UniProtKB/Swiss-Prot annotation:
Site feature May contribute to ligand binding selectivity, where: E45
Keywords carried by this UniProt record: Cytoplasm, FAD, Flavoprotein
Induction: Up-regulated upon transition to the exponential growth phase (at protein level). Not up-regulated at the RNA level.
Functional summary from the UniProt entry: May function as storage protein that sequesters riboflavin and related compounds, thereby protecting the cell against undesirable reactions mediated by the free flavins. Binds and sequesters riboflavin, lumiflavin and lumichrome. Can also bind FAD and FMN (in vitro), but has low affinity for FAD and even lower affinity for FMN. Protects bound flavins against light damage; Trp-36 rapidly quenches the flavin excited state. Promotes the conversion of bound riboflavin to lumichrome.
Phenotype for W36A: Abolishes flavin binding
Organism whose genome encodes this protein: Halobacterium salinarum (strain ATCC 29341 / DSM 671 / R1)
Subunit annotation: Homododecamer; four homotrimers assemble to form a dodecameric hollow sphere. Except for FAD, flavin dimers are bound between subunits with a stoichiometry of 6 flavin dimers per dodecamer. In contrast, FAD molecules are bound as monomers, where each FAD molecule forms intramolecular stacking interactions between the adenine group and the isoalloxazine group.
Entry-linked PANTHER family: CALCIUM DODECIN (PTHR39324:SF1)
One GO CC term, this protein: cytosol
Protein name as catalogued: Dodecin
């Protein structure tokens, strides 16, 4: 089997977990054969915004077609 990894950043005004879910949900909606995800980094945007925005960087792996 051969896998490809992509790095995605999900965002949420609620929590880091919701931000990770945002990235994983998007990956599952747009990629086939998603197998696993790893949280790489987390951060909070606190600059010129009224509310904090949680960001979770997620590395998502999916199996390439015909890789068996």
């Amino acid at each position: 089997m051969v896998f490809k990894k992509v790095l995605l950043t999900g965002t949420s005004e609620e929590s880091f977990t919701a931000a990770a879910d945002d990235a994983i949900d998007r990956a599952e909606d747009t990629l086939d054969n998603v197998v696993w995800a790893e949280v790489v980094d987390q951060g909070v945007e606190i600059g010129a915004v009224e509310e904090r925005t949680y960001q979770t960087e997620v590395q998502v792996a999916f199996e390439l077609d015909g890789s068996q």
